[in-house]
A protein has these predicted regions:
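ATP/NTP-dependent adenylation/nucleotidyl-transfer catalytic domains that generate, transfer
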Residues: 97-186
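A conserved beta-strand->alpha-helix junction
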Residues: 19-44, 144
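Active-site adenylate/phosphate-handling loop in enzymes that bind or generate adenylated species
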Residues: 43-45, 51-123, 169
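Short, well-ordered secondary-structure micro-motifs
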Residues: 14-16, 45-46, 85-87, 179-182
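A generic structural signal for well-ordered alpha-helical segments
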Residues: 24-26, 65, 128
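Single conserved hydrophobic/aromatic residue that forms the stacking wall/gate
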Residues: 2-13
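Short, surface-exposed alpha-helical segments at coil->helix boundaries
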Residues: 15-22, 121, 125
Length: 186
């Protein structure tokens, strides 16, 4: 069963984007479900507002999918999103990890898939322009100056140094040479 989803938007733009998404869903004969979410960033100051918002929306997606007897959720993360997350985890968490193309969520008896994981953001922008899709308006108070926007800029800088940098970063996730990495010191 197919379900078309959207992420949270500010009130000013919400109606415009909602109607645009509704018309896209109708055009493709997909059900259109609206579910409002909210969060309070002061409830957990250890986590960034971006993480809390994302987790709140993701949890709602799991609940809605479960209610509609779905066992997979397809998310629109593209290659840039995955590489930016890798860079964020390396620089902010000291961890080598990112969003995998497939992730089994046993707690929710659900699988997340990311079918656009190999597509670059710039390619999606070109296809959207060619197909005449309207860009979704965002009104996130935390977006500018976020770690993700810093990582987007870092990825651009790495590509300026080496045009193949994104492909090297992508390949590094499956080419881990453990013999050449430090071991945990006891």
């Amino acid at each position: 069963r197919d379900v078309l989803g959207s992420r949270g938007l500010g009130d000013v733009y919400k109606r415009q984007d909602r109607e645009y998404l509704r018309s896209c869903a109708e055009e493709h004969d997909l059900p259109f479900i609206v579910h409002e979410t909210s969060f309070d960033p002061s409830t957990d100051t250890r986590k960034s507002p971006c993480f809390l918002c994302s987790w709140t929306r993701r949890k709602a997606l799991f609940e809605i999918a479960k209610a509609h007897k779905c066992n997979k959720i397809a998310l629109g993360h593209h290659q840039d999103d995955i590489l930016e997350t890798l860079l964020m985890n390396l620089t902010h968490q000291g961890a080598f990890g990112t969003m995998p193309p497939r992730l089994r969520m046993d707690k929710f008896d659900m699988e997340i898939i990311r079918p656009m994981c190999l597509v670059e953001e710039r390619e999606l922008i070109q296809v959207a322009a060619w197909k005449g899709y309207r860009k979704q308006l965002k009104n996130c108070p935390y977006e500018s100056g976020s770690s993700r926007s810093d990582m987007k800029e870092l990825l651009r800088s790495l590509e300026a140094i080496n045009p193949e940098a994104r492909y090297s970063l992508w390949g590094s996730m499956t080419n881990i040479q453990e013999d050449y990495l430090p071991r945990k010191i006891r």
